[in-house]
Amino acid sequence: QKLSVGLGAAALAPLSSSASLFPTFKKPDKKLRVALMGLGGYANIVARAMKECQLATLTGIVTGTPSKIAVWKSNYGIADKNVYNYDNLSAIANNPDIDLVYITTPNSLHHKHVLQVAATGKHVICEKPVADNALQAGEMIAACKKAGVKFYVGYRLHFEPHTRELVRMRKAGELGRIMHVNNYMGFKIGDPTQWRLKKALAGGGAMMDVGVYALNGARYATGEEPVWVTAQETKTDKVKFAEVDETVTFQLGFPSGVIASCGTTYNFNNYERLYVIGDKGFAELSPAFGYGPIQGRTHLGPMNQPLITHQAAQMDGLADCILNGTPDPGMTGEEGLKDMVVVDAVYESLRKNGEKIYLGKK
């Protein structure tokens, strides 16, 4: 994601605490018709949330597990002709009932699946992390541009009211000059056999999966792109975390001189916060990155922002971008690329025993 954090962060528009999330939606002639690809736990969350959507509707599924098909057809009214597997995915190209495919497959499959969907001419949303590395992310962006399709990454918090208010305050100067950022996100992971603990499917561990929340948050909290990275890993369970990172702390240096202290883990709970301090005030979100409810406070008191269904807001918001031409809130593939450049640097620093890794020109 190394183009300019300022672009993504600046696009986070302000939101009044008394306003509904999207009070002025232009209603198009049709809804955005969406197929979900990869019917795991998160796909179920997205599907349920989409029942609240004004501008998007679930019309199709792509799955490699035939036993899931009947339940999904029953729960969401999916027609037989809109059910696909990974072998006949290319046939979506000829299906007018599907405008966009939302990819929620394991991390290391994102690159392959985005290229396949782009080749069908359908728009793409891909869950984060967008890819295994920045090189793959760049290839995905290029493929979507060549195909003439929109490519978004599932940064749902870019539509979340507390997050948007924090960015509004920073942009308006209400926090003053940003002095420090402290972000962390993690949880104690369960089932030791799950794909998130297998590098071939996950691409990495806590840093790849949930560390990107702390990283992305540091970027929009400062409105800057980091110029250097240092990182350290703690591994207390070398059996469970044999293939992937367990707990990572990392520091991001920004052009203004601000240093963000960040952390992520797969080995303990109660680790979720975004805290930005300026010379005029502060803003804190805690919980900051989960599915909600997000809670926030500032030097002025509680934020008192509306509580929303994140995935419904994301899908309606991106449908508005596609159907009505509304500018996107920093969720394109380029935003995913910016994060992956930093993730690559974190892993490089870990390999080099915490060495400072410079981004761009040294």
Where are these regions (language model features)?
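Beta-loop-alpha module in the N-terminal Rossmann-like domain of NAD(P)-dependent dehydrogenases
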Residues: 81-143
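C-terminal helical cap and adjacent loop that interface with cofactors, partners, or active-site loops
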Residues: 7, 301-362
